[in-house]
């Protein structure tokens, strides 16, 4: 079965040389996937025969050669870098002979996303070029990888964009719908008739395609549609931990409404009621993949709130603030149904960045 991956390209050497984006650029221009964990510094710092080790490094043909060196001379033992090299040279190419079912991989460069497939000509090499070794520190490579620009974050599914925020240098994207949407985009932008596939129109798949920002916007546009609440733009600060922004009601501009939204792998998606007790206004909490707890102690005890939305109601009161303002949990399923309705009903105001994903949901 094919898989979809993503590549983080900043290596320790490239960061030290202040060449953070150069590894990604090198990958794109040279049609390779390149990783760090070269043996150069380990050989230099070794008390053993440096020339002997260097000769062995020059003869690396596959991962087993690389692994033999780091085991024999106790390089990188127990470190995660070795696993990244194994993924590159073994796991990533395991489907390369399966035409139209090859593994796909994403790369990010200067805010743009690139997509490639691993083909039958892709081979692992240990590149000893001096610039690669000394400046980029990215000698572990997979060759013959053709990168194609898909676009910026506005056209990239949330399950793809959020996968770049943390994790290993090279890792699978396991989020639901990630593989299928990658295959669909490859088919749309790169190779017509490459692979025909569909994604089930379900709330799980829909939210998997939304970025965290799209999810915030979706909840806001529901409130605008339902209650005509208006957001105060200056309250949407990235350093605000407890809410996304503040809204005002047209019925009473003195009353504030706060929302908090958690979606995707980019952040911790659990919410804690204790964080909202001091807010002086109504609070609406939405978490797609997480749970809501009274506090962090309750999470340690695995005592999440049991929230039941009767008749698929949009929200449910779960607590109050210190000033007796209501705190609500928002029903993701009901919000998804609203988004589906907005896709068909053009009288409902909704940004295209959200609606576009229904084109791929069948």
Where is each model-derived feature located?
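Mixed-charge (Asp/Glu-Lys/Arg
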Residues: 2-101, 106-241, 246-362
């Amino acid at each position: 079965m094919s898989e979809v991956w993503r590549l983080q390209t900043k290596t320790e050497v490239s960061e030290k040389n202040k060449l953070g984006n150069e590894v990604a650029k090198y990958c794109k221009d040279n049609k390779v996937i390149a990783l760090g964990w070269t043996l150069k510094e380990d050989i230099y710092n070794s008390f053993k025969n440096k020339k002997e080790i260097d000769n062995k490094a020059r003869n690396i043909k596959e991962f087993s050669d690389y692994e033999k060196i780091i085991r024999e001379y106790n390089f990188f033992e127990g470190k995660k870098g070795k696993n990244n090299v194994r993924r590159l040279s073994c796991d990533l190419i395991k489907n390369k002979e399966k035409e139209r079912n090859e593994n796909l991989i994403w790369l990010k460069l200067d805010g743009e996303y690139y997509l490639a497939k691993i083909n039958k000509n892709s081979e692992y090499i240990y590149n000893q070029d001096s610039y690669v070794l000394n400046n980029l520190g990215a000698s572990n490579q997979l060759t013959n990888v053709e990168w194609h620009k898909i676009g910026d974050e506005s056209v990239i599914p949330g399950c793809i964009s959020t996968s770049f925020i943390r994790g290993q240098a090279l890792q699978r994207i396991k989020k639901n719908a990630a593989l299928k949407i990658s295959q669909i985009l490859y088919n749309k932008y790169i190779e017509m008739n490459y692979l025909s596939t569909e994604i089930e129109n379900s709330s799980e798949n829909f939210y998997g395609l939304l970025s965290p920002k799209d999810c915030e916007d979706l909840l806001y546009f529901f409130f605008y549609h339902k209650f005509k609440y208006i957001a105060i733009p200056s309250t949407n600060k990235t350093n605000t931990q407890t809410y996304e922004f503040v809204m005002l009601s047209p019925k009473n501009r003195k009353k504030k409404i706060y929302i908090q939204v958690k979606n995707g792998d980019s952040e911790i998606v659990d919410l804690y009621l204790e964080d909202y007790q001091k807010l002086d206004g109504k609070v609406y909490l939405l978490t797609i993949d997480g749970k809501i707890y009274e506090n962090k102690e309750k999470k340690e005890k695995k005592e999440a709130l049991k929230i039941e939305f009767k008749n698929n109601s949009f929200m449910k009161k779960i607590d109050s603030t210190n000033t007796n303002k209501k705190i609500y949990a928002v029903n993701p399923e009901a919000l998804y149904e609203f988004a589906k309705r907005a896709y068909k009903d053009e009288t409902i105001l909704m940004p295209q960045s959200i609606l576009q994903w229904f084109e791929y949901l069948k």
